[in-house]
């Protein structure tokens, strides 16, 4: 029994010891698995960290390479691959000014008109008339301006634009800003980023084509065509009245469009004057052109000296001018700025789905810039006088803190043009002798300047202002387009004192301590008072 007992106990103990060993082995295996799992987790985490670091490095390298590739594409590939199409003249607009300011006529250009215009232009060219209005170089020399096809390239750009920059809002806003500029400054517009198609101003052919469109606006029109009145003003336009676009009472613009009407270019005509060669004949709109030039680009109504006849009655005394009067004169319904706004609205109504660009030469370029500023659309100008002062006087909207690269107004010019550079002033200048007070030099937007004085040895001369000289001898001749950069800080008419109202106050509302009421502003189109007499020094001695 002892043996049996010992044997049973041994077997039972063995079973217990075996179970314990197995449990130990199991625990050891489980512990090993946990350690292996921890090791695998750590390795996986390290691998992910390494991948993240590598991904970040690749992203940085890719971003740098992509930025360079994008810049190359914008300057090379985009220029070749963003063809906006072939543009032709599709409409001619005439807007009356002065007593005829309610007239707005539109001529739709068709095949019959092109044929008649080509025949008349050939006669003009044969007799040497208007030969300075159309470029003479290359394939354009024998081209018919009314049938010429222009090549433009576009690119999509991000611009800053207000939601309110539409005709329904802007004109009432400008009228309100004219009467109460202090309150208008408190109106906060909803500025935001917007993608739109703009002209590719790095492409040489595009810049030349826009300059040609500006030149086309000068070319004489035949006295025929089916003009239609697009205003509510009831008038009959018959016979010789059809050629209103060429008399002294109007502003003209030519409208160009591509094949699918997705892009439309509005080219505004510039100044016609014999003293400005290459800008039209002296009897074509010259009187009102000169008046609007002196309003837009002088410090105070073209008051250069007591010998000058002013174009408005805002001058008070030596180097003192009534600012509210100047603003009212610019906003009058019979001035060119209002005519430009009406033309843009009509083009927008007839081409509602198109991207609208503006261009022009000289006065036409300045007007194109002002209209573009009003509605937040692109404009490319050529040899335009400084229009920044007019932009401020008209209270045109400017986005706060606008980055320079987002501006869509480009001014092309060269250093030998005294009008573009703002040096055509002074008693002995050609502009002053001809009665033009071109006293401004500051431009808004970007300036694209060809330094022909240093590059080509040109001398500053008014003859270099003409459009076909710019196209034939500069835009065509230079290998690359001039770089467009923001202009330096500039101030026009710094020595003038501008008072808000004629009695010297700066606010249209009377203050609490005022001893007499402040004059209220008059409606646009009429100054607050009229000077009836001045003394020898130019001081106004009697008011109407």
UniProtKB/Swiss-Prot annotation:
CDD domains: Lipase_3. It is a single-pass type II membrane protein. Glycans are attached at residues 200, 229, 234. It is an enzyme of class 3 (hydrolase). SUPFAM superfamilies: alpha/beta-Hydrolases. InterPro entries: AB_hydrolase_fold, ATG15_Lipase, Fungal_lipase-type. Residues 1-45 are cytoplasmic. PROSITE patterns: LIPASE_SER. Residues 67-544 are lumenal. It catalyses: a triacylglycerol + H2O = a diacylglycerol + a fatty acid + H(+). Pfam families: Lipase_3 (PF01764). GO terms for biological process: multivesicular body membrane disassembly; neutral lipid catabolic process; pexophagy; phosphatidylserine catabolic process; piecemeal microautophagy of the nucleus; vacuolar protein processing. GO terms for molecular function: phospholipase activity; triacylglycerol lipase activity. Keywords: Autophagy, Endosome, Glycoprotein, Hydrolase, Lipid degradation, Lipid metabolism, Membrane, Signal-anchor, Transmembrane, Transmembrane helix. It comes from the Eukaryota. GO terms for cellular component: endoplasmic reticulum; membrane; multivesicular body membrane; vacuolar lumen; vacuolar membrane. Residues 508-530 are annotated as: Disordered. The chain crosses the membrane at residues 46-66. Lipase which is essential for lysis of subvacuolar cytoplasm to vacuole targeted bodies and intravacuolar autophagic bodies. Involved in the lysis of intravacuolar multivesicular body (MVB) vesicles. The intravacuolar membrane disintegration by ATG15 is critical to life span extension. Belongs to the AB hydrolase superfamily. Lipase family. PANTHER family: LIPASE ATG15-RELATED. This is Putative lipase ATG15. It comes from Eremothecium gossypii (strain ATCC 10895 / CBS 109.51 / FGSC 9923 / NRRL Y-1056) (Yeast).
